[in-house]
Design a protein with these regions (language model features):
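Accessible peptide chain termini
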Residues: 1-2, 412
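Beta-propeller folds
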Residues: 12-412
């Protein structure tokens, strides 16, 4: 606002360099919202999404893979392709690709929707994998890798919809079945969503097992957290005063201020084959963070980093996914200042007994190869049963593990 009130002389006096010969000098009409030329200067909207670490531009009639270095685009598929793969003999199902999602890094799977229906397509195999319909108030959270089970929210409660699970004890026929996992969901009891204020790398609240039969999920009780006063301000261009007030309305948020009472989080596991849910027996959740949930390759064990609220004591623990029993503490890291786990462990595709762990214990985020000892994850507190070897080192940071080269047995 101060800059808007300044003239050209004021700008030069404050250190703005005049345009050199051949360069355009911007005016307030170019830069100020509402200026005569402002609309021509604003960058055009581009709909983009991520496919793992790859950037995809979504357009009305096609999706393009964007080279992050050069900006060059490569067409992945078009709207006509999608409709042909979905239903070659029927009317058009999808009319735009703005909402296309790529849920699995490294897999050629795209999810597109049209109204209440969502289609999952393999765009390399040119094949429809699944088709499902969501009613009003139902929001898809995550599908399993097999595309035969979907976690979704209905209101504030968590559900799972399964398809073609012939061995399911509750669904013998090849049809869909809905399981209601929770019935006490509310503004204060939150299911299947990101917890702990999105800290420690947490960005979601559901985690499918590799075999697609088990769903781990967060349950957050924030009834004890004080409301933080905020307001909902109508969008610019609001033009329906006859049906809704244009005045800001209260929209309090549950925010645990420093030193105040925090929420309590637990981790549940739903079994699609039995329809039963168990909760991990992690003890009293008061002033504790449960972060970076990961599955073992055989879908029998859940791993997570547990952290105290002071954030100076972090433990990698293991739980039996069927019973919820704690089976071991694999690793412990403490620090006088803080510990910040931000990445779940990642098992090697060629060795189900070894995984990659990321830690900043030497001052920089680096990779460590961890191998379970002869006792596996069944030891009580014997951290010596985990062999740890530092893979990277130096005064630089590992930003992300992009994947594995199984032929060369290397990490990317």
């Amino acid at each position: 606002m101060i800059m808007m009130a300044m003239n050209a002389t004021d700008l030069q006096a404050q250190g703005v360099v005049p345009a050199q010969k051949g360069e355009k000098t911007f005016t307030l009409e170019d830069l100020n919202f509402g200026g005569n030329n402002y609309r021509n200067m604003v960058a055009k909207n581009r709909w983009c999404t991520w496919w793992g670490n790859e950037l995809v531009r979504q357009d009305v009639d096609a999706c393009y893979l964007v080279n992050k270095t050069t900006g060059k685009e490569t067409r992945l598929f078009g709207i006509n392709d999608i409709n042909q793969w979905i239903a070659p003999t029927k009317d058009i199902k999808v009319r735009a690709l703005y909402n296309a999602l790529f849920p699995f890094a490294g897999k050629s799977i795209v999810m597109v929707s049209n109204g209440s229906k969502t289609y999952t397509v393999d765009f390399k195999k040119h094949k429809l994998l699944s088709e499902m319909e969501f009613a009003d108030g139902e929001n898809l959270l995550e599908a399993n890798a097999q595309q035969n089970a979907f976690a979704y929210l209905k209101g504030s409660n968590l559900y799972v919809r399964t398809f073609d699970v012939t061995s399911n004890a509750l669904t013998k026929e090849k049809k869909s079945h809905d399981f209601q996992i929770s019935n006490d969901g509310s503004r204060e009891i939150v299911y299947g969503q990101s917890v702990h204020r999105d800290e420690f790398g947490i960005s979601k609240g559901t985690f499918w097992s590799p075999n697609g039969e088990l769903l781990a999920f967060y349950r957050m009780d924030q009834s004890m957290v004080t409301d933080y006063p905020q307001v909902d301000i109508p969008e610019i261009g609001f033009n329906h005063p006859e049906t809704q007030s244009c005045i800001a309305t209260p929209a309090p948020d549950k925010y645990p201020m420093a030193g105040e009472t925090s929420h309590k989080v637990t981790v549940g596991v739903f079994d699609c084959m039995t329809g039963k849910t168990v909760y991990l027996k992690a003890g009293d959740p008061t002033d504790r963070y449960f972060t970076n949930i990961a599955w073992s390759p055989d879908s029998k064990t859940i791993y997570m980093f547990e952290l105290n609220r002071d954030q100076n004591d972090c433990r990698l623990t293991a739980y039996n996914a069927e019973t919820g029993e704690k089976t071991g503490e694999l690793y412990r890291e403490t620090d006088e200042k803080y510990v910040e786990p931000c990445h779940p462990i990642q098992f090697l595709p060629w060795d189900s007994n070894s995984f990659i762990m990321q830690s900043r214990k030497d001052g920089y985020n680096h990779l460590y190869l961890c191998t379970l000892g002869k006792h596996g994850s069944r030891m009580a507190s014997n951290t010596e049963s985990l062999e740890i070897k530092q893979l990277t080192s130096g005064k630089w940071e590992v930003m992300e593990v992009l994947g594995f080269n199984t032929k060369r047995k290397s990490i990317i």
